[in-house]
C-alpha cells in the first residue's frame, strides 16, 4: 500500500510514521509513506496557499490551485481515494478502516485555517472523514488516527494478526478484559477460568465479558449486531445476574 500525505507541516509526521506499528510496517515494505508540503506547489513567490473568503468573514481559506497541482501531479490519470480530513466528514468507524485497508493507494489532505475552497471538496476529493464532533487545529492529527487504524490491518503489520481481528469494534463488540502475570496482585485475582486451560470455557467467558462491557458502555453497538444463539444465551445470563 502507498500512502501520500499533503500537509503544511510535514515535520509532524516524522516520529509517527517511523515508530511502533507504522515504522515496522514501513520497514517490512508493507506500506510506503510519502509526506509532501503542498506549499511547494504554490505559484506565489511567497508560497501563499490561502486567501480571504469571497463574501467576507473571518479566517483564511485554502486556495484550490496548490492542492490540485500537488495531488493531480502525483496521481495523473490514476484515481486513488483522496481523503479530506474535516469535521464535516462522515464519522470514522472500524468498518470504514477495513474498507480503506483494501485500497492500494490512499491520499490524505490535511488542511488548516478556516477551511477549503469548495471546489477542492467537489472536484478533487473522494472522501471526507471526521474522527469526532470536535475541532482540531488542523487535519494532521486526524490523518494519523486514520492511517494508524488502516495500516495495522495490513497482513503482517502486527506480530499476531489475531489481535486485529479481536480488537474492539472488529467483531462489533467491545473487547473482553485482558490479564497477565501475576495471577494475584494486591489481592486482585485473575478469573479462574483463564487459568483453567479449558479453551472452550475461556472463549465463552471472553464472549460473555465482551457482551457485558458492550451492553454497559456502548449499547448502541448491540442494536446493530446480528446476535447468534450463543450471544442471546449469554445476554440472558447477564440479565439473570442482575436479579
Curated annotation (Swiss-Prot):
Chief site of localization: cytoplasm
UniProt EC number: 2.1.1.228
GO biological process terms on file: tRNA N1-guanine methylation
Keyword annotations of the record: Cytoplasm, Methyltransferase, S-adenosyl-L-methionine, Transferase, tRNA processing
Binding site for S-adenosyl-L-methionine: 111, 131-136
Assigned protein family: Belongs to the RNA methyltransferase TrmD family.
Name of this chain's protein: tRNA (guanine-N(1)-)-methyltransferase
Species this chain originates from: Brevibacillus brevis (strain 47 / JCM 6285 / NBRC 100599)
Gene behind this protein: trmD
Amino acid at each position: 500500500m502507498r500512502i501520500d500525505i499533503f500537509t503544511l507541516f510535514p515535520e509532524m509526521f516524522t516520529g509517527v510514521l517511523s515508530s511502533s506499528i507504522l515504522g515496522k510496517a514501513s520497514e517490512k515494505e508493507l506500506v510506503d509513506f510519502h509526506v509532501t508540503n503542498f506549499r511547494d506547489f504554490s505559484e506565489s513567490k511567497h508560497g501563499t496557499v490561502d486567501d480571504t473568503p469571497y463574501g467576507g468573514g473571518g479566517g483564511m481559506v485554502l486556495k484550490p490551485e496548490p492542492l490540485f497541482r500537488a495531488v493531480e501531479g502525483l496521481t495523473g490519470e490514476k484515481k486513488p481515494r483522496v481523503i479530506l480530513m474535516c469535521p464535516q466528514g462522515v464519522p470514522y468507524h472500524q468498518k470504514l478502516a477495513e474498507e480503506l485497508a483494501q485500497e492500494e493507494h490512499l491520499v490524505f489532505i490535511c488542511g488548516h485555517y478556516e477551511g477549503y475552497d469548495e471546489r477542492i471538496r467537489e472536484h478533487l476529493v473522494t472522501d471526507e472523514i471526521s474522527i469526532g464532533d470536535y475541532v482540531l487545529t488542523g487535519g494532521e492529527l486526524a490523518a494519523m488516527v486514520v492511517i494508524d487504524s488502516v495500516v495495522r490491518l495490513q497482513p503482517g503489520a502486527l506480530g499476531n494478526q489475531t489481535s486485529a481481528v479481536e480488537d474492539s469494534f472488529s467483531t462489533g463488540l467491545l473487547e473482553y478484559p485482558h490479564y497477565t502475570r501475576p495471577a494475584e496482585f494486591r489481592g486482585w485475582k485473575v478469573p479462574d477460568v483463564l487459568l483453567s486451560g479449558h479453551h472452550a470455557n475461556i472463549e465463552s467467558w471472553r464472549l460473555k465479558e465482551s457482551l457485558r462491557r458492550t451492553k454497559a458502555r456502548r449499547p448502541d453497538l448491540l442494536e446493530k449486531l446480528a446476535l447468534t444463539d450463543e450471544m442471546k444465551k449469554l445476554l440472558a445470563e447477564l440479565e439473570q445476574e442482575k436479579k
